Every structure is written in structure tokens, then in C-alpha cells.
Regions:
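Conserved glycine-rich cofactor-binding loop
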Residues: 19-21
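Conserved glycine-rich Rossmann-like NAD(P)H-binding loop of the short-chain dehydrogenase/reductase
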Residues: 33-48
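Rossmann-fold cofactor-recognition segment
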Residues: 53-72
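Conserved mid-core segment of classical short-chain dehydrogenase/reductases
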Residues: 96-112, 155
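Active-site helix of classical SDR
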Residues: 126, 162
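Residue(s) in the substrate-gating loop at a strand-loop-helix junction
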Residues: 146
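C-terminal helical subdomain
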Residues: 186, 201-238
């Protein structure tokens, strides 16, 4: 931390998934006047991301080793972040995988791996974070669900089911945190054009990581608990929920 600064006076933003395009776009917007902690595997190879955030005005940028799938390490990881940087003001859960749907339909281990990263690991981190922030009496958590989890489609049901589970867990946790001083914001993006979806045909009403980040920061500033990106997807998926199953099962990704 910058010489002379009190760690308790400077807000700390924890980005879990330190290489995530969306996560980094959010961190860039939150960087001015704050400390940023990037958590990722191979954390020693994040110099480009560190420099980007310093250029954006971060007071300090540090990295920590984070393996989302190693759930038994999550408690110690978060405890170490608090010990070194003080209170976590904002935590952004930006880790996850799409997986290969075709492979997951016949390879049980791959299906389990997708669900473990996209649901089980998130549940672990969220439970630890909620306990820490309850103790602080303040804090904000950003969780990424997806429209894929609002009504699961045949075309991506493994990933979609993990997001459906996460959406339900985060919704319940948000209610449990009501009145605690902790804000949980559940973000439901549609198709996001970026490295994670490279080579895939963009779906209608797609967004960029920058557009998602703008919506997230607006939501954090306004105290929102649900953010759809783009907003039009909320009424669209209200209608989608009502489609007969015979039509729904033929829906593309």
C-alpha cells in the first residue's frame, strides 16, 4: 500500500478471476482511489493486468494465488486477503467456464467439472465472503448468473443448470443478507462477445464486456440487487418462461 496510507481508509476490491475480461473491465472502473487484489491461478503472470489497473488510478494492485476448484483453500485465501489489506469493500466473482456441451453429454467427469467450477466453487466462495462481510457489517458482492440459467435450454443444459443453481443460491443468500449491511448483486447477462465465447456465433441481444461492466458499476452505485444485461432481456425472458416445452427444447443456445 502507498506509504502513509492507512489500509482501513482505502477501499479494497477483490477480483476473483483476475484474468476475466468482464472482471477487469469492472476493476478498471472501480480502480481510482482503491486497492485492487487480483486472485487467479499463476498469479505471478498478471503484470499486464496489474499495469492496466495502475494506469486506471488504483492506489495499489496486488495478486494472490487462487484456484477456484480447490474449495478447501477458499477460507484461508480470503482470510489472508483481509489480514493483508483490511476490510473487503467489494468482491467480484468473475471466474467460471463454459465447458463443452457435446463432450459433457457423454463425459460425466467433464460435466461434473463444469458444475464444480460454475456452481460448487461459487457456493464455497460466497459462503465464506458472506460470513466475512457480515462480520464487517458492510460490503458488496457481485455474482454472475446468466440468462442461460433463467430457463435451461437443451443446447447448453450443463452450463445452464450450473447457472440456474447459482442464481437460486445467490438469490437466497441475498435475502439472508438483507439488513446486514451487505449488498449482494446478481447479474444476469445474455451472450457476451469476448474471449470466452470466441468462435461462437453471437446470440441476439449480445453485449460486450465493457457494456456489462458499465451496467455492474451502475448497479453497485444504485444499490441494485438484480441487473440484466441488456435490460431488454428481463421482459424477453419473462415471455420465454411461458413457452411450451415442445418449442423450448428446440431453442438454440
Amino acid at each position: 500500500v502507498t506509504a502513509g496510507a492507512n489500509v482501513n481508509d482505502i477501499e479494497t476490491v477483490l477480483l476473483l478471476g483476475g484474468r476475466s475480461e468482464i472482471g477487469l473491465e469492472i476493476a478498471v472502473r472501480l480502480a481510482p482511489g482503491r486497492n485492487i487484489v487480483l486472485a487467479a491461478r499463476r498469479s505471478g503472470e498478471l503484470s499486464e493486468q496489474e499495469q492496466m489497473l495502475k494506469n486506471a488510478g488504483a492506489v495499489d494492485v496486488s495478486t494472490v494465488e487462487f484456484d477456484a476448484d480447490a474449495v478447501d483453500t477458499h477460507g484461508d485465501l480470503l482470510g489472508a486477503v483481509v489480514a493483508e489489506h483490511g476490510r473487503i469493500s467489494i468482491a467480484v466473482l468473475a471466474f467460471g467456464i463454459l465447458g463443452d456441451q457435446a463432450r459433457a453429454e457423454t463425459d460425466a467427469a467433464h460435466a461434473v467439472a463444469v458444475v464444480h467450477t460454475d456452481y460448487v466453487a461459487q457456493v464455497s466462495i460466497l459462503t465464506h465472503l458472506a460470513e466475512i462481510m457480515r462480520g464487517q457489517g458492510t460490503g458488496k458482492i457481485v455474482v454472475f448468473s446468466s440468462v442461460a440459467g433463467v430457463r435451461v435450454r437443451r443446447a447448453n443444459y450443463v452450463y445452464g443448470s450450473a447457472k440456474a443453481g447459482l442464481d437460486g443460491f445467490a438469490s437466497g443468500l441475498g435475502d439472508a443478507l438483507h439488513g446486514s449491511g451487505v449488498q449482494l448483486m446478481l447479474v444476469r447477462p445474455g451472450f457476451v462477445i469476448g474471449k470466452m465465447t470466441e468462435g461462437m456465433s453471437p446470440a441476439p441481444m449480445s453485449s460486450t464486456p465493457s457494456q456489462v461492466a458499465d451496467a455492474v458499476v451502475r448497479g453497485l452505485n444504485s444499490g441494485a440487487t438484480r441487473v440484466w444485461v441488456p435490460r431488454i432481456l428481463q421482459p424477453v425472458f419473462f415471455v420465454m418462461r411461458l413457452l411450451p416445452q415442445t418449442i423450448w427444447r428446440r431453442m438454440p443456445r
